[in-house]
UniProtKB/Swiss-Prot annotation:
Name of the gene: HBB
Alphabetically ordered keywords of this record: Acetylation, Heme, Iron, Metal-binding, Oxygen transport, Phosphoprotein, S-nitrosylation, Transport
GO MF, one annotated term: haptoglobin binding
Residue numbers carrying Phosphothreonine: T13
Transcription found in the keyword field: no
Residues the entry annotates as binding heme b: H64, H93
Tree of life domain: Eukaryota
Protein's recorded name: Hemoglobin subunit beta
GO terms of biological process kind: hydrogen peroxide catabolic process
Lineage, opening ranks: Eukaryota, Metazoa, Chordata, Craniata, Vertebrata
Length: 147
């Protein structure tokens, strides 16, 4: 569960309504793979990840980034039940994919950077603070099955 004030919730919802999930999802996942290259081991089937340009232009990275942000959107609609919303994804990433749960925090922070880049002055410190709460809550929910 993420505890947002009514103003924080309104800010998160208003900005998210302007997010191009295809574009931001691909960019966020791509940046994760470039900035934290050890995360690429979970995406070996995606083909060429040999350079930043290859990663950022990879259609499988873009498609999976869109899928990731689709799940994030679901979480935004269920902020009061993030653990329930992400239970199946938590189990998948824990039991089958063996993803280090620290990677969820990294992706959340990268997403915040990408949102700041896309929205500039509209991404105020207050909006960032609200999004940091949300991505921390999502990362915690995704790591739930690890505990």
């Amino acid at each position: 569960m993420v505890h947002l004030t009514p103003d924080e919730k309104a800010a998160v919802t208003a900005l998210w309504g302007k997010v191009n999930v295809d574009e931001v999802g691909g960019e966020a996942l791509g940046r994760l793979l470039v900035v934290y290259p050890w995360t690429q081991r979970f995406f070996e089937s995606f083909g060429d990840l040999s350079s930043p340009d290859a990663v950022m232009g990879n259609p499988k990275v873009k498609a999976h980034g869109k899928k990731v942000l689709g799940a994030f959107s679901d979480g935004l609609a269920h902020l009061d039940n993030l653990k329930g919303t992400f239970a199946q994804l938590s189990e998948l990433h824990c039991d089958k994919l063996h993803v280090d749960p620290e990677n969820f925090k990294l992706l959340g922070n990268v997403l915040v950077c990408v949102l700041a880049h896309h929205f500039g002055k509209e991404f105020t410190p207050q909006v960032q603070a609200a999004y940091q709460k949300v991505v921390a809550g999502v990362a915690n929910a995704l790591a739930h099955k690890y505990h």
